Amino acid sequence: LKCHNKVVPFLSKTCPEGKNLCYKMTLKKVPKIPIKRGCTDACPKSSLLVNVMCCKTDKCN
């Protein structure tokens, strides 16, 4: 699995074994900019300020 790992979406890396999800964290308020991307083994929970999106395909975040 390859996930974007920087705020700019064209940089990606191959996830280590066991981390089979990509995630993207974005601010819930305008501007809804991505603040963190990467690989994870479990989808982090969204919070009051941050929305989390997880997916299982290459570069989907």
Curated annotation (Swiss-Prot):
Locations listed in the record: Secreted
Q: Which SUPFAM superfamilies match?
A: Snake toxin-like (SSF57302)
Q: Does the keyword tRNA processing apply?
A: no
- UniProt tissue specificity: Expressed by the venom gland.
Q: Which UniProt key words apply to this protein? A: Cardiotoxin, Cytolysis, Disulfide bond, Hemolysis, Hypotensive agent, Secreted, Toxin
Q: Name one GO cellular component term.
A: extracellular region
Disulfide pairs here are 3-22, 15-39, 43-54, 55-60
Fill in the misc note.
Is classified as a P-type cytotoxin, since a proline residue stands at position 31 (Pro-31 in standard classification).
Family the UniProt entry places it in: Belongs to the three-finger toxin family. Short-chain subfamily. Type IB cytotoxin sub-subfamily.
Q: What does this protein do?
A: This protein lyses red blood cells, has cytotoxic activity and induces hypotension, but is not neurotoxic. In addition, it induces direct paralysis of the muscle fiber.
Q: What is this protein called?
A: Cytotoxin 2
Q: Which organism is it from?
A: Hemachatus haemachatus
